[in-house]
């Protein structure tokens, strides 16, 4: 069985997220996809948007297929959300499964700074998506470094959609062509 973890703050989710998840699903062909909004990420401040609302917004990802589930595990967990803890939980929940985890290219380049990163590499295959056009050389160098440390890395080709949740929240840029079409009733 293949399980794909797609984590993020998702505050709010947007078409760029949908695009990246679609590409990762095409590359991996997973049996189950776990969309997991972060509780309190270690590299960011806690989201001002309540976890319950972000979970509800993430229901839109289910449009990509019946294998997509939204997990509240990190939102419900006390304290900071470390990827190591999440992946360890998934190993227990899906014993024997091949675990895949999507990350953006910016995260690949700093992955060796993550909490217990070597152990994460031993548990998952990283599915990397580029966020910037033309960052191929830097990505290949970062991937090679992690592969030398025992990591398994694959790239999911997706058109780059320049869109950021922070800009949507701030209202500084109009992303109406990249926001999701479904309105959420809460």
Describe the residue ranges of each PLM region.
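Conserved small/polar residues in nucleotide/adenosyl-binding loops
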Residues: 176-182
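A short helix-to-beta-strand connector/capping loop
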Residues: 65-68, 148-153
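N-terminal catalytic cores of NTP/NDP-binding nucleotidyl/phosphoryl-transfer enzymes
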Residues: 1-29, 33-39
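Short, aromatic/basic amphipathic alpha-helical patches
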Residues: 138-147
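Short, flexible loop segments at boundaries between secondary-structure elements
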Residues: 124-138, 154-161
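Residues at the starts of beta-strands that form the adenosine-phosphate
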Residues: 31-33, 98, 125
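N-terminal Rossmann-like or analogous alpha/beta NTP/dinucleotide-binding catalytic cores
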Residues: 39-123
């Amino acid at each position: 069985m293949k399980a794909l973890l797609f984590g993020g703050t998702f505050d709010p989710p947007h078409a760029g997220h949908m695009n990246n998840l679609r590409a990762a699903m095409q590359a991996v062909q997973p049996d189950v996809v776990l969309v997991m909004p972060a509780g309190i990420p270690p590299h960011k401040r806690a989201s001002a948007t309540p976890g319950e609302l972000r979970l509800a917004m993430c229901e839109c990802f289910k449009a990509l297929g019946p294998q997509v589930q939204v997990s509240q595990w990190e939102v419900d967990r006390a304290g900071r959300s470390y990827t190591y803890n999440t992946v360890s939980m998934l190993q227990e929940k899906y014993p024997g499964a091949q675990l895949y985890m999507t990350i953006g290219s910016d995260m690949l380049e700093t992955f060796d700074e993550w909490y217990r990163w070597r152990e994460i590499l031993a548990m998952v295959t990283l599915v990397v998506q580029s966020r910037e056009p033309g960052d191929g050389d830097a990505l290949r160098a970062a991937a090679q470094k992690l592969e030398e440390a025992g990591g398994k890395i694959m790239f999911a080709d997706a058109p780059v959609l320049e869109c950021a949740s922070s800009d949507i929240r701030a209202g500084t840029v109009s992303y109406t062509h990249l926001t999701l079409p479904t309105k959420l009733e809460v």
